[in-house]
Amino acid sequence: MTMKVHKVHSRSQQRQRNASKQHGKNKWNKKVRSLDSTLLNTSSGTAKLEQEIAKKEKPAIKRLKKLYAKPVTLLSDNNCADEDKVKPTSVTFAHVHTNGGTELDDSSRSVDSQEWSEYANSVLQNGMETSTLPDSDQAEDGLQFHAHLDHTKNRAVLVMKQSQVLCFRGKCLLTCLYGHVEVLGFTIEEGQQPYPVFSPPTHCPLTITALGNNQSSSKNKKEGQLEAKAIVRKYFTTEPSKKLMNEVDSDSCVVLLESLDTPLTRFLSSFSELTELFGLNSKELKSQAAIYSPVLSAVGVTALRGPCAQGLVMSRSYKETISSLLSAWAGEFDRCPIILVCGGKSSGKSTFNRHLINSLLNHTASVEYLECDLGQTEFTPPGCLSLCTVTEPLLGPPFTHLRDPEHMVYYGQADCQSDIDRYLESLKSLWRNVSGESPVIINTMGWIRGHGFQILVDLVRLFSVTHVVQLSYGTAPQCQLLTSEFIRSAHGWQTHPPTTPALTEDSHSPSRSHVFLSVQSEFEGAGVSGEMRFQRSNELRDLALLSYISKLQSSDPGPIRPLHCFIPYQVPHSSVAIGVTHCEVAPNNILYAANASVVGLCCLSEKVVGRGGPVILSQTPICQCVGLGVLRGVDMGRGLYFLVTPVSPSVLKHVNCLLLGEISLPKILLTQQHGVEGDLPYITTDYSFEVQGAGKLHIFKGLTRPGFIKSDN
């Protein structure tokens, strides 16, 4: 029997839904103002050419051409001294009456007139603001970008010279208007869609690198310069400053930065502990790494300088490995590359994977991603194993780009030590859905010793890996190198030499070797778990769960609704089975344990039929999971579960199994329940873990205690 879903909507919610339908959906369409040629300080022929270029429509969204991106020039290490805050040296505004449409030519005014105009416009704040850095700081930090702000639409145009780099914290919506820029390995060119970029202190800061214009263009430098200037003018209601326009040439990159406001950012910022999530970390604050720029600050971006502005630190082996993997995809092989990335904790695997995915997306439409790391997942909440098809760049940490994978299994824990066999069998079931038409990236756990290393050996064999990327740090490797020679004689958890045939190989085919690539991580703090705020592993897991729960919020701007304000689905006990994945719980106590907990919403192949009570699973199944939910309450009298989940009803109707795991709700969801008077639900301090039986009993399946291992002697 499939899940029966009943959900009742209040009248106020219906009125809000009807009202939202009356508003337009396209948020980014803007009216473009046409310029009069008499306003330009150029010849009539040049003005006419600029008008023709400005009248051209903005190119439609397109995929990036299959061209290799230009190399990125890295910032040099500069000393980050304690300096005073840098203030803009010039603030220039166009002389326009705010209540009319008259514009005056600056060239005919006297010096006194221009000074009075600048003073008047600085008081009026006439919808425009230009920000540049003083020449001394530009020379010191290499940041010679120029930005211009349109207050009326809260967006900024950033002009960058070729090879210039902007390292920043914050979040914004980025659109490339002219030229090419690169962010975390992904090349963005003019005409492509806007991309959200997130640079919180949970990870290294992002950088925007100007790659210049396309060299294959048939336009000469003058035509390219006029085209770039015309594009800049299209995004302002009044004439931009001369200082900004003088910086625009045919080799410039013009980027539009807009404030980013999404249900995710609104939901996270509603918690007092997360108000500085997109600000600076303690080290950046202490070293005064922030550059004062009111234009960038207005759109949610803080530029960095000095050693804090290095961004992603790539060693020579890092760059060579990325180049080698791109060549493997571009070359003609009998099958797509299958790339397994491994390494110890805090060695940089996740960042390397994102960089590799973005680099591959410059040359292919999609990349398949097999998630084997239960604790630090990329696209799902923690505790999930998944297979995703990635088609969009990853321009932020994992909690900023969660998505619904095509195939997912709910394991229910942040590690697999308690049941390694179920872990491997779950991955095998996911691997059977790999298409084989796109490059595959396999992300692994940071558990590389003991049984964790045996699991790595199994994964290399079972999935017929073509490339193994092993990240290490320091002078000595953290584990044995996973070369082809070593794999032939190594013992895994399930596989042993001679090599067991891989899932994709014929049993009579000879064993294949793989390409081994070693990457030396040279960034500061490699191998050391994050100790600053928002960098601890449990905090990152909480952010991933909060990001998933934020899908419940409305896409329209408005107040944030607490979890207890959502009307739950009513699910009959007889239509779904329930089980516990991570420990042994007496059947009579399972519903007590599941109340107010996170559950996996799964689909069993067989029907579930109950007789007058809850259906309890005796074993944990390996089955498709469509998402997570919060079991808000249990009504034993009516035989109902009350479930809150962002999963759509069309998908939810196929769910017939609820799996309770070790993944729990973030504390702040329970401690900050707005709108509740008196005692907070599910919160108590009157509890003692010293009472016998108060804690949970961990069961490690398949692992024998050392004292009970029989000796061969």
Curated annotation (Swiss-Prot):
One of its GO terms (biological process) is definitive hemopoiesis. One of its GO terms (cellular component) is nucleolus. It is found in: Nucleus; Nucleus, Nucleolus. It catalyses: a 5'-end dephospho-2'-deoxyribonucleoside-DNA + ATP = a 5'-end 5'-phospho-2'-deoxyribonucleoside-DNA + ADP + H(+); a 5'-end dephospho-ribonucleoside-RNA + ATP = a 5'-end 5'-phospho-ribonucleoside-RNA + ADP + H(+). ATP binds at residues 343-350. Disruption phenotype: Morpholino knockdown results in hypoplasia of the pancreas, liver, and intestine and defective hematopoiesis. Defective pre-rRNA processing within ITS2, resulting in the accumulation of ITS2 containing rRNA precursors. Residues 1-39 are annotated as: Disordered. One of its GO terms (molecular function) is ATP binding. SUPFAM superfamilies: P-loop containing nucleoside triphosphate hydrolases. Pfam families: CLP1_P, Cupin_NOL9, NOL9_C. Residues 1-32 have a biased composition (Basic residues). Its main location: nucleus. Gene3D superfamilies: P-loop containing nucleotide triphosphate hydrolases. Keywords: ATP-binding, Kinase, Nucleotide-binding, Nucleus, Phosphoprotein, RNA-binding, rRNA processing, Transferase. Its EC number is 2.7.1.78. Belongs to the Clp1 family. NOL9/GRC3 subfamily. Polynucleotide kinase that can phosphorylate the 5'-hydroxyl groups of single-stranded and double-stranded RNA and DNA substrates. Required for the efficient pre-rRNA processing of internal transcribed spacer 2 (ITS2). Essential for definitive hematopoiesis and pancreas morphogenesis. This is Polynucleotide 5'-hydroxyl-kinase NOL9. It comes from Danio rerio (Zebrafish). The gene is nol9.
